[in-house]
Design a protein with these regions (language model features):
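Post-HExxH zinc-binding segment in Zn-dependent metallohydrolases
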Residues: 317-358
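Residue-level detector of functionally pivotal "anchor" positions at catalytic/ligand-binding pockets or at interdomain
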Residues: 491-517, 533
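Active-site recognition of the HExxH zinc-binding catalytic motif
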Residues: 291-306, 399
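N-terminal prosegments of processed precursors
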Residues: 19-97, 367
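Acidic, glycine-anchored loop motifs typical of Ca2+
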Residues: 218-231, 388
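Fold-level signature of zinc-dependent metallopeptidase catalytic domains
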Residues: 83-129, 190-198, 238
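Non-catalytic C-terminal accessory/binding modules of secreted extracellular proteins
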Residues: 31, 116-121, 125, 131-156, ...
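Short, glycine-anchored, charge-dense loop/turn motifs used at functional sites
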Residues: 526-532
């Protein structure tokens, strides 16, 4: 008897090869001669390598520095794999995303590795209404011939995966998601994960066939009646390679079976679009937080990676959004348990947010994104079509206010974030949004220059600067972070005066300036900061 759990989730049918970025930090690997060595992982499922403490690329088998010829061969292999993985997205540009009312998650064991986490716990992590957890552990590693121990404490988490997608969509979509299994596959984990996940397609195929044999009706997962299952998510037992698991483990990713040598048909439907991730965190030894799941499921929705997917130049000049964003390094926030909420751009792309275009000079009061449900857009000509997944002009800037609350609790800082968008259908389709220093697709405008591999509080305004003048004729000055998280600033030199704006949501309170005093506007009534009606 299969056990099915339901959860409110979201899905779409965009299918481009995408994956989790490698977790930064030292991990221990064992060479073929038994020697242990501290290494650092770079890249993602489709293009990755490891280095030693000095930054030398290492041979995966011997853990010795590669020769120039070996590195060139690795670069060629990575390029070939990227080219092979580039697939065309199903047409969605300029049209409504195809949101499936139900989705399927299949738990699988390997022949030599079974789930140690109870199915009920996985269920709660995916769909629990009030999911929470706490734990602590010591992580020991060697660096520069010295041994260090890092004590990690997680005293609470953001919530379940269901809660994450409900929150970041502001409750606009509530499909059902079913969790089944675990089922046991026919082979050891190394069979599916070896040689850069060479046989992972067979894991997806077997998982679907085992679920089908158990009575799962796949026809309910073809929302648009196109003869294909909208998507399948496989959660596999044990470690994943992205956060330090052995090389033979599978790297969490999103892909399409139709662009591999594997074909799968169940209940007369083709299985194509899939995502997968691991049960256990290599660092903690406990079940993985929702960060990886939410990152991979965001690809199912149609969102691309925002870290550098080219791999070869990682951390050597391309500064991406890092811990600020779920599609970059953010899924590792709070030990992988509290990924950041969707940015204004991601909500704009999904159709959940329509930013306001700044035109004339004004003194702006901008509430935190999740309170005001608002963002501001700046572009040449001061006019925009406001279609997130087919923008015109394609180049524009978004300003949003973020505070360290809710899913954003573990952001590097808070305040005003300004992001430059340079949309290219080709780069989005091929998951290469931020692979060129001169052609970044989603580029955080750091308030203070930051070239490190870590996001900083000074990336935000006003922590890094109280003005922004990088975009001619769209200057922001007097940027101020107020108690409660809102920001104010002068746009195009406007003086601070009373701010008259509309309410962002039916019952959402909004702080405003009235005759130089801070007041709160809610349901058509003005209140002072003590809650007295004015």
């Amino acid at each position: 008897m299969k056990k099915i759990f339901s959860v409110l989730m979201i899905s779409a049918v965009a299918v481009t090869a995408a994956a989790m970025p490698a977790r930064r930090g030292p991990v221990t690997r064992t060479a073929e001669d038994g020697t242990e060595k501290t290494v650092f992982l770079h890249g993602d499922a489709f293009s990755h390598h490891m280095t030693d403490e000095a930054g030398n690329w290492l041979d995966e088998t011997t853990l010795r520095p590669m020769s120039a010829e070996q590195r060139a061969a690795r670069l060629q292999k990575n390029a070939a794999r990227r080219q092979a993985r580039r697939v065309q997205q199903k047409e969605q540009v300029g049209s409504t995303l195809n949101l499936a009312p139900r989705g399927l998650l299949i738990m699988v064991n390997f022949k030599d590795k079974a789930f140690t986490t109870p199915a009920d716990t996985i269920h709660e992590m995916i769909n629990g209404e009030n999911f929470n957890r706490s734990y602590e552990y010591d992580y020991t590693y060697t660096y520069n011939r010295k041994t260090y121990t890092q004590h990690v404490v997680v005293d609470h988490v953001g919530g379940s995966a269901r809660r994450y997608f409900h929150d970041v969509s502001w409750g606009q979509y509530n499909p059902q998601f079913d969790v089944v299994g675990p089922y046991t596959l026919s082979q050891n984990y190394a069979y599916y994960g070896r040689n850069d996940d060479a046989n992972v397609g067979y894991m997806i195929k077997e998982a679907c066939e085992l679920a089908d044999a158990d009575g799962v009706d796949f026809t309910v997962y073809d929302n648009n009646n196109d003869g294909e299952v909208d998507f399948v998510y496989v959660l596999y037992a044990g470690y994943g390679e992205a956060d330090g698991g052995p090389e033979e483990t599978i790297w969490p990713h999103n892909h399409d079976l139709n662009y591999t040598r594997v074909r799968c048909t169940v209940d007369g439907l083709e299985v194509g679009n899939y995502a997968c991730s691991n049960e256990i965190s290599y660092y903690s030894g406990m079940y993985n937080g929702v960060g990886t799941f939410c990152h991979e499921f965001s690809h199912v929705l149609g969102l691309p990676d925002l870290y550098e997917t080219n791999n070869e130049n990682s951390w050597l000049g391309l500064h991406t959004l890092l811990e600020w964003d779920i599609l970059d390094y953010g899924p590792y926030n709070n030990d992988g348990n509290t990924p950041p909420a969707y940015s204004a751009y991601e909500r704009f792309f999904m159709g959940w947010l329509k930013p306001r275009v700044l035109t004339d000079a004004e003194y702006v009061w901008l509430n935190p994104l999740d309170i005001g449900r608002e963002a501001l857009l700046m572009c040449d000509g001061d006019a925009h079509n406001l279609v997130g997944n087919n923008p015109n002009p394609a180049t524009f800037y978004l300003a949003e206010c973020r505070t360290k609350t809710g899913w954003d609790e573990y952001l590097p800082g808070e305040g005003l974030l300004i992001t430059k968008i340079k949309y290219s259908n080709y780069n989005w389709t091929n998951n290469r949004v931020n692979n060129s220093a001169n052609n970044m697709g989603v580029d955080l405008m750091e308030a203070k220059a930051n070239t490190s591999e870590y996001a900083e509080p000074t990336d935000a305004f006003p922590a890094g600067s109280k003005q922004w003048t990088a975009y001619a004729d769209h200057e922001l000055s007097q940027i101020t972070l107020l108690d409660g998280g809102a920001v104010t600033f002068s746009y195009r030199g406007a003086k601070p005066t009373a701010i008259e704006t509309v309410q962002p949501a039916d019952d959402a309170p909004r702080k405003m300036l009235r005759d130089g005093q801070v007041v709160i506007f809610r349901n058509g009534v003005l209140y002072d900061l003590n809650g007295r009606a004015l």
